[in-house]
């Protein structure tokens, strides 16, 4: 947007797509799948200077995101003081509402209206992925979906005779690219970059008497939705998606925010009074972004990258060097048995020095109890990498 405003470029085409469902079907049907390699970077490329996770996290949680987000979810559940059963129902009802929206979305991938119990209760069709998340809590990236949008100046739109009815205006955006491994974040559920980027948008809205009334909160996993909702101070009862969310509408990898933005622009075209706020995430709730849209150019567009501010104020917590000792659990999950490992718990703790450590447990009684009562906040003993 800033490049268009400055005259550096006249227009930009933003495209995203995913054909993973086609790839999946080719595998199932033993057919060849042809994939075109992308060997060049986009014009604007932000390369991460830090890793998404530390070695201990990768060793026990792997590279899939679900375990990391499940640990964040446990921390948020404890912060909200919800019991295990209350939390199951809360997430089930939130995502049941999402499924209803996806069912009426002509572009939605799963157009089925689920009851909250269908989502909350694990079974063969909705297996546990990482406690407390079942399959229907998780983003669905096995989709065939594509989307595109064009950004240009009013001057070019006039030259091309683009009808006013089709024009939507970006009002403001913000982002943070500050990276801290999940376990090293001072506050697991309130990262500073998220707070600063959200505050920038909220301040613009407050100063200009703009009130967002339509939301699309990034929904790779339920904890992301809740963290965005809290940061934006959204009142209970508001719809938090226009697509139906990534579990049901579809979650094409690396391009969902384009899809969700296009859907938001359609919503604003159909109802000119809507002011839309779209959010995005990268990594393990590592980076966040916000974009504010409206039918009219209510204010001059502005953007802020809060990365440097966040880097200066939020530092990673040290990893514990203790081989044996006591600690307090700050988050946990239980991963189901897979091809390479048995069912196990992955536990984040803070030791008596205030440093962080990743622990594991294979104790079946502990694993069972972790799904029945809250373990966040418990004082525990450890030896090496194991819960003692």
Enumerate the language-model features and the residues they cover.
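Active-site capping/gating regions of soluble enzymes
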Residues: 276-278
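Conserved "HGTGT" condensation-loop signature of ketosynthase/thiolase-family condensing enzymes
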Residues: 2-156, 162-249, 266, 280-282, ...
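C-terminal capping/lid segments that line or modulate ligand- or cofactor-binding pockets
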Residues: 287
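A conserved active-site cap/scaffold subdomain adjacent to cofactor or substrate pockets
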Residues: 249-257, 268, 273
């Amino acid at each position: 947007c800033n490049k268009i405003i400055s005259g550096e470029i006249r227009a930009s085409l933003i495209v995203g797509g995913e054909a993973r469902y086609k790839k999946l079907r080719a595998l199932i049907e033993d057919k060849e799948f042809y994939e075109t390699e992308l060997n060049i970077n986009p014009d604007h490329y932000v390369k991460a200077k830090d890793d998404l996770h530390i070695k201990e996290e990768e060793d026990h949680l792997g590279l899939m995101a679900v375990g990391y987000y499940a640990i964040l979810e446990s921390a948020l559940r404890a912060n909200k003081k919800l019991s295990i059963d209350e939390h199951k129902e809360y997430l089930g009802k939130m995502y049941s509402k999402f499924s209803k929206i996806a069912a009426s979305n002509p572009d939605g991938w799963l157009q089925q209206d689920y009851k909250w119990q269908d989502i909350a209760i694990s079974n063969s069709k909705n297996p546990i992925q990482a406690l407390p998340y079942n399959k229907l809590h998780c983003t669905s990236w096995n989709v065939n979906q594509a989307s595109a949008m064009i950004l240009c100046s009013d001057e070019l739109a006039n030259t091309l005779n683009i009808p006013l009815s089709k024009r939507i205006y970006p009002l403001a955006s913000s982002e943070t690219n500050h990276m801290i491994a999940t376990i090293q974040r001072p506050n697991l559920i309130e990262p500073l970059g998220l707070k600063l980027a959200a505050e920038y948008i909220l301040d613009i809205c407050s100063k200009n008497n703009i009130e967002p009334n339509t939301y699309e909160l990034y929904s790779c996993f339920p904890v992301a939705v809740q963290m965005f909702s809290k940061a934006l101070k959204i009142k209970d009862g508001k719809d938090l998606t226009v697509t139906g969310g990534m579990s049901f509408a579809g979650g094409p990898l690396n391009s969902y925010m384009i899809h969700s933005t296009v859907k938001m622009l359609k919503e604003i075209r159909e109802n000119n009074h809507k002011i839309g706020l779209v959010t995005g995430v990268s990594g393990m709730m590592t980076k966040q972004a916000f974009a504010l849209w409206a039918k009219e150019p209510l204010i001059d567009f502005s953007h802020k990258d809060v990365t440097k501010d966040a880097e200066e104020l939020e530092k990673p917590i040290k990893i514990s060097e203790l081989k044996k000792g006591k600690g307090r659990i700050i988050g946990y999950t239980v991963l189901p048995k897979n091809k390479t490992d048995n069912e196990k718990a992955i536990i984040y703790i803070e030791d008596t020095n205030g440093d962080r450590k990743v622990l594991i447990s294979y104790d079946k009684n502990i694993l069972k109890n972790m799904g029945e009562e809250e373990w966040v906040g418990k004082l525990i003993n450890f030896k090496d990498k194991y819960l003692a």
